A protein has these predicted regions:
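Conserved SAM/SAH-binding beta-strand->alpha-helix loop
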Residues: 76
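Conserved SAM-binding loop of SAM-dependent methyltransferases across substrates and taxa
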Residues: 54-65
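Conserved SAM-binding loop
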Residues: 83-84
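Conserved beta-strand signature within the Rossmann-like core of class I S-adenosyl-L-methionine
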Residues: 140-148
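Conserved alpha-helix/loop element of class I SAM-dependent methyltransferases that forms part
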Residues: 27-43
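N-terminal, positively charged/glycine-rich alpha-helical extensions of SAM-dependent methyltransferases
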Residues: 1-17
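Conserved SAM-binding strand-loop segment of SAM-dependent methyltransferases
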Residues: 88-98
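Conserved class I S-adenosyl-L-methionine
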Residues: 44-53
């Protein structure tokens, strides 16, 4: 699996670092986190963090919200192993969630940074992202929130770059085939966007 190999190679080079997660800096990661805080009240919510890395977002959540129930999953065993050492109170688990989701439903699912890897062709990248979004959305009873590298018009992609820049409007159009209740934000970073998808049953 190409995304797993990308992260594994990064971890070999950088160890427990934001660079292993393909973030330019901790500040860049926190900037994305703040988009979630601005929209979501996590109190009394059952939250799944897909692609949790070392669990830093979970640490923020459980400190900020007294009554949140948090679970983090990541495809990388090395991330989870080290995350449990850094944040022993967090519920962290190794899982290939996009391909093998479990049956549990969550009030809120969040995904920060796990939809950025360059998997090859434009079609391969598009299908990976659409499958991941649909899988997560089908397992939330209320809200899916995710961020992704890209914008509109999208930045130029290259095979040599581990990051793939998606066309944000194409991603938004796909999300709206699953629900019309969406919030789209692209005002906080020139090459990143966040989408909130509400799982509201139409009457």
């Amino acid at each position: 699996m190409k995304s797993l190999n990308i992260y594994r190679n990064k971890f070999k080079d950088f160890g427990v670092s934001h660079k292993s997660l393909q973030w330019k800096s901790k500040g860049a990661a926190h900037q994305r986190f703040r988009q979630f805080w601005a929209e979501i009240d996590f109190d009394n919510k059952n939250v799944l963090d897909v692609g949790c890395g070392f669990g830093e977002l979970g640490n923020f959540l459980t400190k900020r919200y007294k009554y949140v129930t948090y679970k983090g999953v990541d495809i990388m065993p090395e991330f989870i192993e080290n995350g449990k050492k850094i944040y022993p109170s967090l519920d962290l688990e190794v899982a290939d969630y996009f391909n093998h989701p479990k049956g549990e439903l969550y009030d809120t699912i969040i995904c920060s940074g796990a939809l950025n890897s360059n998997l090859g062709t434009e079609k391969e990248n598009r299908l990976f992202r659409e499958n991941a979004i649909e899988t997560m959305f089908l397992h939330t009873t209320n809200l899916l929130a995710f961020n992704m590298s890209g914008g509109h018009p999208s930045l130029k992609n290259s095979k040599e770059n581990n990051i793939y820049y998606s066309d944000s409007l194409e991603i938004l159009k796909y999300c709206m085939t699953l629900t019309r209740r969406v919030i789209f934000r692209q005002n906080y970073h020139p090459s990143d966007f966040t989408i909130f998808m509400y799982n509201v049953r139409e009457k």
